[in-house]
């Protein structure tokens, strides 16, 4: 969890609603309007900033749901929790605590945290989350296939399924918190599931080590099995000091975003042009460089837009955590433009993390959903983005 407050890298900010965390930055006022999108803040931990208030939603990060239309599961990096919502933001009663290394669930988990007076021990720091389509990844200590799987900045991967005791605790299935050494363990920023010729695997972006760590199904020890790939997810042309930050499975290919590491190799260093995106197959072979520098600024969220998403229908959308902007690319990796608001200003979402199409309970698969950790990751936001009407007249 980053402790540094981040600026939006913009010379001006326009608040779209009273107390809103959504802003439009006036960096490029001279260009003509090319597109228009509207943001709906659904859930926030801060009163008045969204339709629903949930104090547990701090630094909202990864999002997952089942194809059968489960609620949206949203990882709360600041509170060590995964909270559940409908597509309209209605909260579901279940919330799941993510354990620290050693399967410890601190009392602070799934409770609001004061960043100026953090608890000791602090809760876990979940990031990426996936719905598990495989029966081969079991919750440790059970014969239950995991339903949702969570990665953390603590260097762990945890699993959850219905029927656990207690029912609201995930269980650690892989622990690299001390690998290669205590105090220098893995920092997982993202997680996806993918299929290769060898079967189903989990792929975790290890920001500290600069690797994609791969896990196969449950082994004889009851834990997920470390795996290797033929290609190793290597790109010798990525500059030193950059590491895998986000990861997404788009049409069977793995898109990996790279951000600049800070001195501790725990958090990113935001800045214009600080970012790269590569495309790999699920056996770790580099297929192509998709994007380099340019509009990228600590890119993390990435998805393909629906084919009912206005001017950017079907395009690859890449969200910048560093400045909160959303960039549209064609399939070749050619940058097209940024998303604008209805007034022609670049759309900015402070602390932007996930971009994902709908599909969870009460949502449309044409709607783009997002999460964010505004105000230096101390607060949280879950919402959606849809095409907007451009105002007419002066």
What are these model-derived regions, one by one?
Residues 1-12:
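Bacterial N-terminal signal peptides that target proteins for export
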Residues 10-20:
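Bacterial N-terminal signal peptides
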Residues 21-25:
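Sec/Tat signal peptide C-region and signal peptidase I cleavage site
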Residues 26-394:
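Sequence/structural signature of beta-propeller domains
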């Amino acid at each position: 969890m980053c402790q540094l407050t981040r600026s939006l890298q913009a010379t001006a900010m326009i608040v779209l609603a009273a107390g809103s965390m959504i802003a439009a930055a006036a960096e490029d006022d001279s260009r003509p309007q090319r597109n228009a999108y509207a943001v709906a803040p659904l859930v926030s931990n801060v009163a008045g900033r969204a339709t629903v208030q949930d104090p547990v939603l701090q630094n909202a990060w990864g999002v997952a749901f089942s194809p059968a239309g489960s609620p949206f599961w949203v990882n709360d990096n600041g509170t060590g929790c995964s909270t559940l919502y409908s597509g309209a933001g209605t909260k579901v009663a279940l919330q799941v605590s993510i354990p620290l290394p050693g399967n410890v669930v601190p009392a602070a988990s799934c409770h609001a945290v004061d960043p100026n007076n953090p608890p000791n021990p602090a809760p876990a720091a979940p990031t990426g989350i996936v719905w598990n389509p495989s029966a081969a990844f079991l919750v440790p200590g059970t014969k239950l296939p995991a339903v949702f799987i969570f990665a953390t900045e603590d260097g762990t991967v945890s699993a959850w399924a219905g029927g656990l005791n207690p029912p609201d605790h995930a269980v650690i299935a892989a622990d690299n918190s001390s690998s290669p050494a205590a105090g220098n363990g893995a920092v997982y920023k993202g997680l996806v599931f993918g299929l290769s010729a060898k079967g189903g695997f989990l792929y975790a972006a290890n920001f500290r080590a600069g690797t994609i760590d791969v896990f196969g199904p449950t082994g004889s020890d009851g834990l997920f099995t470390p795996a290797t790939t033929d290609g190793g997810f290597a790109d010798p042309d990525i500059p030193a000091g950059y590491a895998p930050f986000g990861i997404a499975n788009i049409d069977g290919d793995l898109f990996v975003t790279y951000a600049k590491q800070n001195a501790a190799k725990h958090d990113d260093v935001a800045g214009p042009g600080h970012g790269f995106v590569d495309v790999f197959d699920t056996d770790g072979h580099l297929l192509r460089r998709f994007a380099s520098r340019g509009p990228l600024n600590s890119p993390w969220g990435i998805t393909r837009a629906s084919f009912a998403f206005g001017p950017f229908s079907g395009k690859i959308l890449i969200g910048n955590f560093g400045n909160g902007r959303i960039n549209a690319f064609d399939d070749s990796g050619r940058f097209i433009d940024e998303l604008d608001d209805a007034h022609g200003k670049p759309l900015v979402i402070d602390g932007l993390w996930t971009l994902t199409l709908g599909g969870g309970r009460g949502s449309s698969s044409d709607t783009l959903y997002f999460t964010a950790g505004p105000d230096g990751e101390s607060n949280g936001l879950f919402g959606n983005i849809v095409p907007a009407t451009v105002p007419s007249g002066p």
